Curated annotation (Swiss-Prot):
This is Bifunctional terpene synthase Agr4. Its EC number is 4.2.3.-, 4.2.3.126, 4.2.3.127, 4.2.3.15. The DDXXD motif is important for the catalytic activity, presumably through binding to Mg(2+). InterPro entries: Isoprenoid_synthase_dom_sf (IPR008949), Terpene_cyclase-like_2 (IPR034686). The keyword Metal-binding applies. It comes from Cyclocybe aegerita. Mg(2+) 1 binds at residue 87. Mg(2+) 3 binds at residues 222, 226, 230.
Length: 342
């Protein structure tokens, strides 16, 4: 891959996503409580703590779960903050260590009596109690299975990072769908809505076409928006931008433009497949698909409302679309005070 340019222009993904964005009226209360909860565990060193605060994960939940009641929104905030912990810890680990971290998360989620005393296990147990209070049995079973797939793919991501390997597009897409945790976040929609879809719904062709299109839209949009941040940290191999540039031998700008075309395609597949959904699947299946659309548009809106991806220039980037690439960051001295517990 040739040297990167000094800047590139983002695709205008908002213009090709006609879905309606919203925010949750319970956001401030749920966000404050969830942030206090995660902060009480003192998980991060100074730079990561600042990054966590600036990212405003709870604001993302306000957009993508704009229809949730207070208790459900608080639970989603807790989960997204928990995912941030898993992601930040595993990003600096070897494949073996990342798999061990993931296993702590899975075991704490899966088994009521399992506990290794780590902060990660405690965080996961706290979330588990909130989630199980309202989630249906089929939703819980699928959620736990997705937790296992997520952690396996996070471990695979760490192994690829160790070796410096960049996957081809066909191999990368299923990995990204899982290690992004988007499917886990979609699974929370059933919990929020108080529905418990039959497994057969997840085998329906039109349902799956809409489901995967929504997932890929979130993943690809996230990757092009986060590319500058990730390349500055040396973590851009787990990003569709890098994968496409490597496989197609294209420039950063041409790749960004292509992602814009693909995201527009994902939107159309989602909308068309949603319309084709058979009424025989029941109103809950249609409601679920309608609700994951909030993830597609809400993810776009949130990305420009915080400094997570674009730093202090986030409003300017929203206006111009121009991203000025940052230099590589120096590694932070020291590590989280509880790194031995993860």
């Amino acid at each position: 891959m040739s040297a990167l340019p000094s800047q590139f222009k983002l695709p205008d993904l908002l213009s090709t996503c006609p879905l309606k964005d919203g925010t949750n009226p319970a956001y401030k209360k749920a966000a404050a409580e969830s942030r206090a909860w995660i902060g009480s565990y003192n998980m991060f060193a100074d730079r990561k703590r600042a990054f966590f605060i600036q990212g405003q994960n709870e604001l993302l939940c306000s957009h993508v779960y704009c229809y949730a009641g207070y208790e459900q929104l608080r639970t989603t905030c807790d989960f997204v903050n928990l995912l941030f912990v898993v992601d930040e810890v595993s990003d600096e680990q070897s494949g073996e260590d990342a798999r061990a971290t993931g296993q702590v998360f899975v075991n704490a989620m899966k088994y009521a009596d399992w506990h290794d005393g780590s902060k990660l296990a405690k965080l996961t147990k706290d979330f588990r109690v909130r989630f199980l209070r309202l989630a249906g049995p089929k939703n819980v079973a699928r959620f736990v299975a997705l937790c296992e797939s997520y952690t396996a793919c996070v471990g695979k991501e760490a192994e690829l990072r160790e070796s410096g390997q960049v996957l081809g597009v066909k191999e990368f897409i299923p990995l990204r769908r899982q290690n992004s945790a988007v499917l886990l976040c979609f699974s929370l929609v059933e919990y929020i809505l108080g529905i418990d879809l039959d497994d057969e719904v997840y085998r329906d062709e039109n349902f799956l076409n809409a489901y995967w299109a929504a997932c890929d839209h979130v993943c690809w949009a996230n990757d092009v928006y986060s590319y500058d941040m990730e390349q500055s940290k040396g973590l851009s191999n787990n990003n569709i931008v890098t994968v496409l540039m490597e496989e197609n031998h294209t420039s950063l700008q041409d790749t960004s433009d292509y992602i814009g075309e693909k995201c527009a395609e994902f939107v159309q597949i989602y909308l068309t497949s949603k319309k084709r959904l058979s009424p025989s699947l029941g109103p809950d299946a249609a409601l679920f698909l309608e609700s994951i659309g909030s993830w597609m548009v809400g993810n776009l809106a949130w990305s420009f409302e915080t400094s997570r991806y674009f730093g202090s220039r986030h409003l300017e980037v929203k206006e111009t679309g121009i991203v000025i690439l940052r230099p590589r960051e120096l590694p932070e001295d020291g590590s989280s005070s509880d790194s031995d517990e993860e």
